[in-house]
Amino acid sequence: MSETVLRGARRRERVVVAITGASGTVYGVRLLQALAATTVETHLVISPSGQLTRSLETDWSKEEVESLADVVWKPSDMAAAISSGSFRTRGMVVAPCSMRTLGEIASGVTSSLVSRAADVTLKERRRLVLVARESPLSLIHLRNMTALTEAGAVILPACPSFYAGAQDVEALCGTVADRAVALLGVDAEHYEWGE
């Protein structure tokens, strides 16, 4: 169906998900799983370093991770729909977000589809959630996070919620994914304090 036919029709909301090379591929996978249980259409891009980290940290194949998304984009495809502000989305989550990616986004460098899509998300005033995964943090990291927060991004440290009663590492990482989904304003089942 062409875009012309869809104009004015009700579309599914879209969310862009990026997985970069920081340790913690499980955060991106749990995010995709959480979003799959909603009505949003997910657009996934995995950086080359993200693919390497996935292969080192997990037993998930590239195909298994990509199958969790509705649409998968190549990280070098700078003409992808998600690289344009005219392609409407609810927002974008980078999970995990390496400090390299965070630095590129903070400085406006758009050398990959991940940083370009994040740049578009910011310029269009859409929600950008960065699941930062680094420890300890240098002053440069903190300044980049400050610049991004001032530009409208949300820095969501990869700090699990232990009070939710998770029994394993994957479930703990799921608490961070649930927070990212909530920050996007997507209606989904997740643990809420006091509920």
Model-identified regions with their sequence ranges:
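A cross-family phosphate/adenosyl-ligand binding-site feature
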Residues: 1-195
